[in-house]
Amino acid sequence: HRNILITFEYSWLSRTAPYFFNKKYDKFLFFDFSLSASYEFLRYFNQVLLLNDYLAIDIYTSIYEDPVLSIDLEKKNIIPTIRKLYEEEYYFTGTVVIPPDLSWCAAQYYSVDWGVFAFDTHNKKSQSLFNSLDKDWFVTIYQLQKSLNDKSSPLYEEFGREGIEAILNNYA
């Protein structure tokens, strides 16, 4: 896990997106909810992970080199375990969720900022996970591309043309 570079240059995805990649990541989904406190999403995500045979995840913060939490999804539900992030005030740092095989990754600078899921779709399990996720939870590259010249788009209002271009330059 140490070979993953975690630098969040700016807190807003629209300025410069978080860089935490291993170069194998080739599909991306963006989200605007708290990765550690959106219990409705976490409940859903826990089920999708298990259905796609992901049985463990590690949770990192930007202040520690080792995981602050390792969750065996067969034995523990993600929600009560991830609440420890709030109990121990880790939500003041960046959050990264990643499986031991590094086939996908989710990162968010602060819980109020936009975050990104990254997938290595050459990995069959990761491709299956990407396909299984309900895209209504996320903003896709396609949606960003459509919003680039549409000033009435909520994404254009959120990021502006320069912000969307920065995201597309880093992720498309």
PLM regions: where:
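Structured alpha/beta or helical-core interaction and ligand-binding surfaces enriched in interleaved
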Residues: 1-172
